[in-house]
Amino acid sequence: METVVDNSGYPLTSGIGFHKEGRNLVLTLNKRSLVSNMQSDAGAFEGWALCLFANNPGIYEKIFIQWNPIERFDKEGIITDAERGHYYRFLYRAYKFQDNYPTIVELQPAVSSVFDVDEFKDWVLNYPNGESRESQKSNKNAEAHLERELLEIMQSAFDYCDHQLPVGLFFKDVSKKTARCSGGLGQIDLWSVLNGSLNIYELKNDVNLSVGIISELMFYTNVMNDFRMHRFNYPAEFVRKRKFYRHSKELYDSISKDEISHVNGILLANNLHPRITDNVIDLMNQNAVHITYSKQTVNDFISLLRR
């Protein structure tokens, strides 16, 4: 193996091994990568892979993701509950990464060779059980505060919109015992629906610069695309609820009626990691599932909404 070619001038994370093998970019993930938060440097394998591939044109033809499965991970004592949630999410993310980019991404081993991917068909989403908490208004830099400010401006620009949409995934029904990803805590920052398009915004403030924003957004857009395609659904008890929160019923109804035809993912930040170039966005848009990605500054987004 050769040293990885990277002409960006910016440091690589120490949490992932990077090598060049002929015309192939090889990422080697250790156990920490498999059980880390996807926005962490060690966990954001999609972000690092796409940035290196796109920003070094003509150098690489394929991306290989090498990893060692954690045996008996679903048994108590092998890994912690939190790590198990991250590992289930890794399995889904890795499977989707190859599914989204089948001509350039190869998993070694393939997820389907070590995990029954048919289980994904039985995963269900959790849903809001109440209004979100008021953000800490004294902290003007907090993403939660910025999120609420943007949501207020968004109200008149879309068919409907909201924030903190849960994306916890569970096996057949929502319970602590059946939790798969996020432990019920994962949520989409901001989202909107307009003319049949579901827009997913991954919001970062001016000091939160990370390649992991790519991995986060790709996870959320793939989950919502699977929801749109009826591969995921809300559990049966959702429709029996008397009260719904954060426009979850409107979204459910739109999806049930096949009114959502497209998913857009938007990196929403005034400053992004310098590796996240236009070349990276172009590569992200070459996915086989027709999710559209873009980046937009918070300032431009506000200006557009106020026109």
Q: What residues fall within each predicted segment?
A:
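Charged, terminal alpha-helix-loop-beta segments
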Residues: 1-307
